[in-house]
From Swiss-Prot:
Family under the similarity heading: Belongs to the UPF0122 family.
Entry function: Might take part in the signal recognition particle (SRP) pathway. This is inferred from the conservation of its genetic proximity to ftsY/ffh. May be a regulatory protein.
Regions annotated as coiled coil: none
Name under which the protein is recorded: UPF0122 protein SpyM3_0842
Length: 113
């Protein structure tokens, strides 16, 4: 796997974490198997009794759907920005217990399921 493929896989996994609840069961299954579990198109096709082309088409459509959700809702990009701000605040104010506690609370809100 080259760097571009790894970056795409990481992005799809991140978008999936944020938007999985908005997908159909089939879309969730295919994306999770393909990106998170590293199944091949053939393995997914065998698992669901469909053609490789059907799996490929569904995955490509779902990738576009996930990107569209992100373009409209910005949940992932906002999370990344918040995380960077929190990291910066922690680095600049390591002895401020009140601030550390509030950052911890905000981080736990971001990471809840």
């Amino acid at each position: 796997m080259n760097i571009m493929e790894i970056e795409k896989t990481n992005r799809m996994n991140a978008l999936f974490e944020f938007y999985a609840a908005l997908l159909t069961d089939k879309q969730m299954n295919y994306i999770e198997l393909y990106y998170a579990d590293d199944y091949s198109l053939a393995e997914i096709a065998d698992e669901f009794g469909v053609s490789r082309q059907a799996v490929y088409d569904n995955i490509k459509r779902t990738e576009k759907i996930l990107e569209t959700y992100e373009m409209k809702l910005h949940m992932y990009s906002d999370y990344v920005v918040r995380s960077e701000i929190f990291d910066d605040m922690i680095a600049h104010y390591p002895h401020d217990e009140y601030l550390q506690e509030k950052i911890s609370i905000l981080t736990s809100i971001d990471n809840r399921e």
